[in-house]
Amino acid sequence: MTDAKKDGFAHFDLGAMAKSDSYKLLASVIMPRPIAWVVSRDAEGLLNAAPFSFFNILSADPPLVAIGFSAAADREGKDTLTNIKAQGEFVVNLVPEELAQAMNITATNAPRGVDETRLAGLELTKCEVVNVPRIVGSPVGLECKLFQVIETGGTGTIVLARIVYAHVRESAFANLAKLYVDPAQLRLIGRMHGSGGYCTTRDTFTIDRLSWPLEGKD
C-alpha cells in the first residue's frame, strides 16, 4: 500500500506489490466475472475441462473471446493452455447454477490423464465445427478456433479465439427471430472474490439508454 492520503481510499503501486498480492487485490475488485468452462482435447484425444474467470468477449467483428492463463495456475489451467496451443480449437461453455458443483469438480488439481468431464459426470454432445464436444447442461456453448496467443512477458498468457459456431438453449430466447435473449432463463453464475465466491445473474435491473442532447442538461 502506498502513502496514506486520508482521502478515504487505500492506494496501491502494483509494480511494487508481490504478484500474489496484486492478483488477490484485482480478483477481489474486478467482479463479477463471467466463467469460461473450457473443454479441450489433447493429442491423444483425451478430454480436459476447467473453468476460467479471466474471460470475456472482446470483439463482435470478428467474434473474439479472450481467456487469461497464469503460469501459477493449477495443473488444469496448464493442460488447457497446452491443448489449445497444440490443437487450435476448444469449446467455451457458460456455467448455469445447476452445474456449479460439477464445475467446481473440474477445477480440482487432477493429475494429467484424468478426464474431468467423466469425473464430474458431464453429458457431452458433438459440435458442428470443432473436434471437441460441448457440455449438454450448459445453456450456451461456443465453438472456438485459436486466433492468437499473447505472451504477456510476466507469468500470464492471453488466448484470443474466434467463435465459429454458437449453441444457445432455445428456451432462453424471449424472441428467437429477433435474437432477444432472456438472461434469467440462462441462470448463469459469475465469479466473485476469494477461492470460492460466486454470484447468480438473477437480480438485475434495466436503465434505458439516453440520446444526445440530454434533456435538462446544458
Give residue spans per PLM region.
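Basic, polyanion-binding surface patches
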Residues: 1-218
